């Protein structure tokens, strides 16, 4: 499915290649057989607006959106397992699937990075690719809702993936669920995460319980990321 390749590329960090090959990308969108005209048009507008930006501005916007906090992380298992040990095994299992289909990762790539997962699905027969999208549909809906809440143009890419998945997920209900969710990309929230890492460090070094308790009281209101149970239709 060429559509998955296109979206994968658009969800990657916007490097110089995006501008160099924008015409080819426009042509690939126009040639798509799985996108209705209105969706192809929306995708074309996204690409037009993105490539109209100064590359440095586009890169800064991308980093602010996807690299700060966990709520809009493009690492799929971040929204399922968090930092639990289950995440490591899930990574191993996914990596094995990639290798079975001849997809080799470099040392800096994580298997659950969404653009990489889409690249993998694009190599599969269409029916299998659609099933692969359905597997992550609750995560896609969650990310779409959070991006819409932040008025980000990137939300259109997740809406498109949900349409390709032909999923029955109610996006309005997902939006309602996260309506009062605290932002985790504010300076205060990011500082709280940093402080939490310090607590873990001090605990490992034998710091007294009183210091840890005092810290926990101070940051009791820090933002905690929501995790999904994708085996039950994306319910928390």
Segments the model singles out, each with a brief description of its role:
Residues 1-112, 118-236:
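Charged, alpha-helix-forming regions
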């Amino acid at each position: 499915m060429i559509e998955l390749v296109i979206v994968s590329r658009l969800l990657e960090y916007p490097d110089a290649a995006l501008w160099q090959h924008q015409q080819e990308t426009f042509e690939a969108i126009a040639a798509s057989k799985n996108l209705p005209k209105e969706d192809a048009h929306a995708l074309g507008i996204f690409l037009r607006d993105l490539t109209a930006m100064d590359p440095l501005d586009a890169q800064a916007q991308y980093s602010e959106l996807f690299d700060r906090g966990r709520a809009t992380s493009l690492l799929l298992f971040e929204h399922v397992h968090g930092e639990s040990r289950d995440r490591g095994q899930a990574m191993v299992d996914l990596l094995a699937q990639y290798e079975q289909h001849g997809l080799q990762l470099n040392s800096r790539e994580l298997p659950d990075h969404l653009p990489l997962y889409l690249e993998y699905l694009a190599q599969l027969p269409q029916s299998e690719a659609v099933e692969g999208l359905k597997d992550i549909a609750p995560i896609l809906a969650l990310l779409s809702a959070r991006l819409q809440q932040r008025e980000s143009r990137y939300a259109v890419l997740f809406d498109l993936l949900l349409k390709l998945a032909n999923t029955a997920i109610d996006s309005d209900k997902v939006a309602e669920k996260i309506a009062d969710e605290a932002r985790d990309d504010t300076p205060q929230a990011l500082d709280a995460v940093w402080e939490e890492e310090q607590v873990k460090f001090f605990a490992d070094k034998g710091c007294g319980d009183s210091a840890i308790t005092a810290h926990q009281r101070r940051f009791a209101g820090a933002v905690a990321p929501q995790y999904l149970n994708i085996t039950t239709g994306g319910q928390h």
